[in-house]
Amino acid sequence: TACNPTMSPSICLSPLDRSDTLRYLGMTEAAADNAFLSRLDACEAKLLRHATPRYTYCILPLTRTESVLYADTLLLEGNDIRQHLEGCDRAVLMAATLGTSVDVLIDRTQKRDMTNALLMDALANTAIEQVCDKAEQQIQETMPNRYFTWRFSPGYGDFPISEQPNLLAHLNAARQVGIITTETYLMNPRK
């Protein structure tokens, strides 16, 4: 296989984008009072202490026939992924996580305080997006003068989520960063 997964350089999380977190909660800044924002800040501090952000990636050559797209030996099913990668000769395959301790923290918090667990879950969504953004930036720095599309994942459009295990296996994500999939194709850790 042409995929030789690269372990990530370290990623340090910055303070999380509050507007993104509030959006995940279905809220606006105007709806959040000082007491709520203090609670959110406390949850963020705790979440960031537990997060161990990591990612792995590899760069794969793309080959096409009339109706089929391959990234290395991986068949990429669906019209949407083919359209997304139209004009590209390579694809970056990436997996990222905040680590299992974030899932454990959210699960434990859920047993004691559902509101804080909900806040932490939204914060974790914001945090994993930040990890992916920083990973993407680091990857782009290794490939100057290349065009990059936006990220596309199994489950988007008609790109089947059932492809998740194949992509993660190609990256050796279980060994590289500790990500596996469940029987229903969800990633574990969740974030």
Q: What is the predicted function of each stretch?
A:
Residues 3-120:
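Active-site helix-to-loop segments that bind/position phosphate- or nucleotide-bearing substrates
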Residues 98, 145-191:
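Short terminal or interdomain "cap/linker" segment that borders an active site or interface and mediates
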Residues 115-137:
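Compact, glycine/acidic-enriched structural inserts
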Residues 53-62, 137-153:
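Flexible, glycine/charged-enriched surface loops at secondary-structure junctions
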Residues 102-104, 127, 158-162:
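Short, well-ordered, mixed-charge alpha-helical segments that flank or form enzyme active sites
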